[in-house]
């Protein structure tokens, strides 16, 4: 069976197995994300403590991702992913059991979030660079777009299901079902033949590998641009796990089910953007499109600061979802293509560092501003900061020669 052009990466059998497993496990992961935020607000009622949770979960990405990117180039990627996926499943199971039996406290959630962040620091660059091993450069654009579509389809399904389950059965179900969802991707990895073999020279130190990756990335003007754009949008826009629950509880006054639908609106928009990119055959970075997407996403945050209606919030979150994923997926694809095979894990670790490593700062600031002022003020401040930074990057790009 041959898949149509828009799904052509699925013609690779191992990628197809990996893709199906990722879809299921990511639905579970989004269920956990919603459940975790709701649980913290139930336990503490504090926007600052919710923001601190995000800081703890993503701090390991900031601290260690450049080293784990070098690790991804040194070890068989399939085996690394087996270890990380099993570990994530166990962490979800532990949290679910603590909640089920009424023993959970805020510090439990923080410790488990920190451990999850440590595992994800290894998992994310390995998973990103493994895609190229599964499909080759010819289909990498389509594969990255399909991955984005899967991730964001899960962002639709997971929050809706989690919201309904939390409202009906309790928050523990989000964590227990997430643990169960990882059995599919673990089974897929066990059946795959592609190992994602190491590509670095033997006898070199990991620090030398890290230095080589950093030097290469900083020497290429286009990669510097991509990383700067990614930094701005990740820092200001992608704090949905803090923005949206606070909006739901403090501004819109909706229950867990309403919160789930708000998170799903972001996912619907993101899937729309990802599928649009998936039909592109030529992986050229169209800078005007990417910059426009960034301005729309940050402008959407400014508009969200004035929103008090549930349906308007859904529409605005959809727009932010479309625009933000166009920028992020374009950066992901362009970085994959710009990196030589031997350096891809290290270059993608910089993607992970910026995309995930900004969350400790962004989520803490959103929580802090929301507690001191309001979540609407946090939206406004982030939006204005993002628009200003993007304008400065545009001026830099036009003034610096090739």
Pin down the residues of each PLM region:
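C-terminal transmembrane bundle of multi-pass solute transporters/carriers
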Residues: 62-67, 74, 80, 94, ...
């Amino acid at each position: 069976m041959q898949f149509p052009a828009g799904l052509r990466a699925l013609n690779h059998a191992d990628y197809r197995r990996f893709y199906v497993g990722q879809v299921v496990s990511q639905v579970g992961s989004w269920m956990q994300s919603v459940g975790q935020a709701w649980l913290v607000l139930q336990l503490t009622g504090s926007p600052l403590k919710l923001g601190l949770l995000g800081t703890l979960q993503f701090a390991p990405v900031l601290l260690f991702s450049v080293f784990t990117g070098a690790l991804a180039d040194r070890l068989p990627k399939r085996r690394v992913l087996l270890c990380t996926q099993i570990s994530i499943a166990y962490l979800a199971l532990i949290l679910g059991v603590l909640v089920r039996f009424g023993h959970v406290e805020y510090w439990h959630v923080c410790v488990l979030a920190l451990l999850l962040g440590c595992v994800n620091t290894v998992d994310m660059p390995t998973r990103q660079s493994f895609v190229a091993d599964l499909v080759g450069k010819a289909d990498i654009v389509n594969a990255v777009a399909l991955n984005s579509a899967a991730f964001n389809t899960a962002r639709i399904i997971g929050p809706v299901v989690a919201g309904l389950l939390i409202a009906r059965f309790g928050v523990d179900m989000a964590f227990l079902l997430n643990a169960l969802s990882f059995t599919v991707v673990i089974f897929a990895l066990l059946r795959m033949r592609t190992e994602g073999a190491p590509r670095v020279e033997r006898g070199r130190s990991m620090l030398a590998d890290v230095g080589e990756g950093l030097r290469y990335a900083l020497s290429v003007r286009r990669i510097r641009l991509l990383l700067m754009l990614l930094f701005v949008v990740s820092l200001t826009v992608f704090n949905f796990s803090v923005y949206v629950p606070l909006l739901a509880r403090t501004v819109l006054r909706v229950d867990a089910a309403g919160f789930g639908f708000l998170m799903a609106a972001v996912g619907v928009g993101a899937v729309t953007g990802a599928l649009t990119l998936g039909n592109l055959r030529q992986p050229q970075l169209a800078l005007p499109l990417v910059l426009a997407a960034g301005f729309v996403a940050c402008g959407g945050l400014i508009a969200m600061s004035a929103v008090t209606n549930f349906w308007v919030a859904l529409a605005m979150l959809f727009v932010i979802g479309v625009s933000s994923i166009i920028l992020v997926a374009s950066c992901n694809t362009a970085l994959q293509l710009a990196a030589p095979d031997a350096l891809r894990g290290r270059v993608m670790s910089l993607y992970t560092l910026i995309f995930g490593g900004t969350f400790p700062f962004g989520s803490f600031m959103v929580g802090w501003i929301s507690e001191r002022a309001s979540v609407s003020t946090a939206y406004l401040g982030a939006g204005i900061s993002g628009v200003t930074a993007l304008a400065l990057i545009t001026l830099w790009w036009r003034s610096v020669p090739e």
